[in-house]
């Protein structure tokens, strides 16, 4: 009898834990911010997990070439993509082209964005506010508009394209530019570099604008040449922003579709994004699985880039300049004529690109 009454008075430890957990859950969801966070977290998980599972299933599926239905599951799609008889033309060449275009796009983005950021933050350039606003236009504009602008300017009747016509440049000058300037690696990388140049401008411009000039001034006092100050002092301080820009532009350019399909497909210059789309949505159901394998490759590359960014961010060393007062960087003089000429050139370039 006593043991029965004791069991009634003392609840089961399991139910005590359940009740405690329920109270903690109610307390957690009692905060609106936590509820919103969990909701969007679950939504994000579903929007990424379901497509990922679907893609992985498709990579393992073999479809009937005529009926298009799944006949079996095998690793054959992976073998055909990486080591099959058509792997070189279907996968490796487009992948190498994409990597080359992405590297070149990083160069152009750093060139355009870096030079503009330096001119605006370190010189007496005219129309700084206007140029800063206009410089964002190439990124705001859709990629395909920039690609169409390039093609309409430089296309000509001499290129190897069935639908070739006389573009604006040929109509005005009578000069037919070579094929490589209209279609292929160079125009794709150039347009992508122009499109993503605002990334470099924002990241590098922020560092240049807030950079402590004491180190640069100390180097100048020691009679170190200005070009050496730039490469030995300024550039190292910009390294984190440069690396972030490279990772951001590289990953974006690698997965770009609109520009490669406009400036590459007319001459059968396929990158991995356009090749993947052609294989997935093409008329041959037998190679759709290989196209999905390519999408997995793009996802893996994206994850690797994210991990590299996290690693370099976590291992970045912080330096502090101990001084009485932070100095402002010296404004470089472009000259009475130079500042107007450079300003007009930048405005013209960015207006044409936007």
What are these regions (language model features)?
Residues 67-70, 258-285:
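Glycine-rich helix-loop "coupling/hinge" segments at transmembrane-helix boundaries
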């Amino acid at each position: 009898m006593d043991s029965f009454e004791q069991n009634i008075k003392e609840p089961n430890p399991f139910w005590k834990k359940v009740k405690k957990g329920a109270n903690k859950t109610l307390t957690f969801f009692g905060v609106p911010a936590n509820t919103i966070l969990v909701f969007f977290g679950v939504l994000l998980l579903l929007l990424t997990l379901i497509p990922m599972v679907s893609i992985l299933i498709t990579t393992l599926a073999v479809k009937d070439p005529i009926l298009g239905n799944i006949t079996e599951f095998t690793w054959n799609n992976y073998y055909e993509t990486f080591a099959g008889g058509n792997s070189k033309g279907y996968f490796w060449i487009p992948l190498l082209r994409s990597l080359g275009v992405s590297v070149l796009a990083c160069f152009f983005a750093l060139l355009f964005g870096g030079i503009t950021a330096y001119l605006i933050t370190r010189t007496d350039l005219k129309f700084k506010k206007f140029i800063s606003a206009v410089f964002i236009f190439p990124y705001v504009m859709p990629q395909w508009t920039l690609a169409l602008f390039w093609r309409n300017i430089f296309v000509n009747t001499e290129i190897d394209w069935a639908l070739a016509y006389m573009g604006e440049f040929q109509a005005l000058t009578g000069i037919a530019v070579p094929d490589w300037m209209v279609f292929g690696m160079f125009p794709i990388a150039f347009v992508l570099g122009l499109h993503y140049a605002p990334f470099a401008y924002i990241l590098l411009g922020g560092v240049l604008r807030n950079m402590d000039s004491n180190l640069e001034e100390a180097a100048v006092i020691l009679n170190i040449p200005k070009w050496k100050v730039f490469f030995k002092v300024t550039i190292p301080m910009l390294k984190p922003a440069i690396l972030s820009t490279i990772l951001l532009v590289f990953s974006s350019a690698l997965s770009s579709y609109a520009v490669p399909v406009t400036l590459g497909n007319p001459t059968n210059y396929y990158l991995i994004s356009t090749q993947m789309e052609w294989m997935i949505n093409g008329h041959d159901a037998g190679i759709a699985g290989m196209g999905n394998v390519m999408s997995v490759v793009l996802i893996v590359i994206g994850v690797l880039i994210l991990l590299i960014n996290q690693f370099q961010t976590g291992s970045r060393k912080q330096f502090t300049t101990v001084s009485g007062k932070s100095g402002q960087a010296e404004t470089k003089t472009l000259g009475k004529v130079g500042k107007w000429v450079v300003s007009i050139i930048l405005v013209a370039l960015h207006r044409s690109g936007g």
